[in-house]
Amino acid sequence: RQRQMCIRDRDNTFGGFLSPDDKSLYYVKNDRILLEVNLTTLAEREVYRVSDDWVGYGTWVANSDCSKLVGIEIAKSDWTPLNDWQIFHDFFHKGPHCRLLRVDLRSGESQVIHEEKIWLGHPIYRPFDDHTVAFCHEGPHDLVDARMWLVNEDGSHVRKVKAHAPGESCTHEFWVPDGSALIYVSYLKGQQGRTIYRFDPESGVNEALMTMPACSHLMSNFDGTLLVGDGSGTPVDVKDTGGYSIDNDPWLYVFNVAEKRYFRVARHDTSWATVANSRQVTHPHPSFTPDDSAILFSSDKDGKPAVYIAKLPAHPSMLSA
């Protein structure tokens, strides 16, 4: 059964998430108001409101038990709606005043964790460890100093995950859902392929797992034994698109980390276009179903952005990395 949760304009396209008990939906409205929707009654409760001098930015992410979240706010005086990739590039050079904060989902109380005059994004609690928060220095991947950072929840011990090598870009970091590692993708100027890396937050060691076709986004199953990625073309979020030119790839891939092999699942055939002033609604952002039997992804292959499920083949044709 399909139900529409909200009917008004300016709802955050990506920020919605469900509570673990499936009783509540949380989302951000107008870049400012965090709302909780009761999925039984559809009643809305305002959890948190961004102050007038700030604007809520990007995706806000809850901890494992959904008792609090981390998010990014940008000073209103620096804010520009990021409606296309040229504005994305220009905004990086502005050096906007940003702050990483946490919000209690019950009381609505907030606390600033980290603050800089640099573009911050992609905040993520480490699963099952509220003490550790990942965030990024946002912007064109070939211009940022170092993309991935960790900070303790109390604001102490800010540390970078990886120092970039010359010509290296790193992107789309995520925590393995069991909290064991941070996984990300590295790619080098002038090369078609990409390398999947694993960062151990306890030891601080970065380990190259395997090479892969050029994918825009990666996600793993619960324990990180399988990864899924969406084949892509030349990245739009770099300054030197000529130096990072790659062939377009319309496939969804699953990667077996232990075997260092992978297989194709299905074509996503998305256009990667900006739609309704949103830069990412056509991006596949694939993920596994809870039982690892299928892939959930987005595409506009049939005209408008929609969500699809592709079942994993029973006998896949494995390819070597």
Residue ranges and their predicted role:
Residues 2-7:
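Short, small-residue-biased leader/transition segments that mark boundaries at the very start
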Residues 30-99, 108-118:
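Asp-box/WD-like beta-propeller blade repeats and closely related beta-sheet repeat scaffolds
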